[in-house]
Amino acid sequence: IFIECTRDGINLIDNNIIWNVEGRFDPKKIPVEPGSTGWYKMEEHDVVNGYGIYGEGTDHLRIVNNLIGNCRSAGYFAKPVSFRAEGMNRGGTSVDAELINNIFYHCEEAAIKMPTKANKAEGNCYVKEEGGYLRILYPQPPVCLHLPAWQEFYGFDLQGQEAWFDVDVDTEKLT
């Protein structure tokens, strides 16, 4: 789900199954990074995507009661579009997003990639997610956390949980 530079009111994404999000990119254009060199990059390569929900400059986004899984990159990713302004308007900040009571399942890079800590996450369940799956990208360097650190350092997901079980969604039969 892509929502772009919405600045007015609240936008709600609720009660969805978002599954097997591979993204649109040419895998041949992704450079091979030996060893841990990719761990120290300050930003993502521009050809990789695969976000379950992608907020581009959208403020006041509410993401509630969704099952988001098997995403190539992240279940939720947002970035500001600071210079997308016309006339007397401002750019999009991607702040005041609230991710509430969602299940994030085995997203390859991260369950959540928030642009800043000016957002909220509460009551989410993270299933089959591995190290550094909760991220705040700015100010740089990004922080890559697990649930206990997310709770301790940012006060996010105090009612959140981690779990390890299998989910199988039949995308043909929608079951």
Language model region names:
Residues 1-174:
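Glycine- and acidic/polar-rich repeat regions and solenoidal domains
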